[in-house]
């Protein structure tokens, strides 16, 4: 509803570059759920987390200072509980070799299969603030299929109609719409997530320096969406 009231200022005690878990917690406060995950600090904790989330999991470096984890050896996928302990030790060594820093924390995440991958971000330029929306994952790297939704200057909310129209402008829209016998993606849940992300951008205003989810997993119709990776940088200032 374009006549919805402007979002109230939101207290955001964190500032600086948030780690992935903190960024997802921030996004979840506004209505964008994340994948199931557990933060760990040791191989033994990682094994226990993998047993809870398995049968196969993702292991990631957890750091607010290193945002591009894969470039320093900080991501491993498709691990079993038996594999994750040794893999964590190797990851810690790789990160230290690449960065000179000691890796102190890691995330163990559930594996999500059969989902479309979307990128969702905040884009700022002289015209104002916009929501960046497009296909994520490998598709994003290959064809850069994105569109921008400019947020209203008067603080009015985006509408579901605007978001769905933007999705339909993507060249890869058919991948969400049952292309060649694929399951139709949960587009209503994706629209809700985009609206929630926009509310966050409006509520935090200029304090939100950067925010991105890539990928946001869009599961088959009725199964919702999950943020799998997240970046957020919060500036200092009044909340």
Regions found by a protein language model. Give the residues of each.
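ATP-dependent carboxylate/acyl-activation modules
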Residues: 1-239
């Amino acid at each position: 509803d374009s006549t919805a009231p402007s979002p109230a200022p939101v207290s955001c005690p964190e500032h600086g570059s948030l780690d992935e878990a903190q960024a997802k917690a921030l996004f979840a406060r506004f209505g964008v759920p994340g994948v199931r995950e557990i933060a760990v600090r040791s191989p033994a904790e990682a094994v226990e987390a993998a047993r809870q989330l398995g049968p196969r999991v993702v292991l990631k470096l957890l750091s607010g200072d290193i945002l591009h984890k894969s470039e320093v050896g900080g991501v491993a996928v498709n691990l079993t509980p038996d594999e994750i302990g040794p893999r964590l030790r190797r990851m810690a060594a790789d990160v230290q070799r690449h960065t000179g820093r000691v890796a102190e924390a890691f995330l163990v995440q559930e594996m999500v299969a059969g989902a479309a991958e979307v990128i969702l971000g905040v884009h700022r330029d002289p015209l104002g603030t916009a929501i960046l929306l497009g296909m994520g994952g490998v598709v994003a790297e290959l064809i850069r299929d994105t569109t921008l939704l400019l947020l209203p200057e008067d603080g009015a909310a985006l509408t579901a109609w605007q978001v769905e129209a933007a999705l339909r402008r993507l060249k890869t829209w058919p991948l969400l719409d049952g292309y060649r016998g694929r399951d139709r993606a949960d587009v209503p849940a994706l629209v809700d997530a985009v609206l929630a992300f926009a509310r966050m951008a409006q509520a935090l205003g200029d304090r939100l320096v950067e925010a991105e989810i890539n990928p946001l997993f869009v599961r088959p119709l009725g199964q919702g969406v999950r943020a799998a990776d997240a970046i957020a940088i919060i500036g200092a200032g009044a909340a």
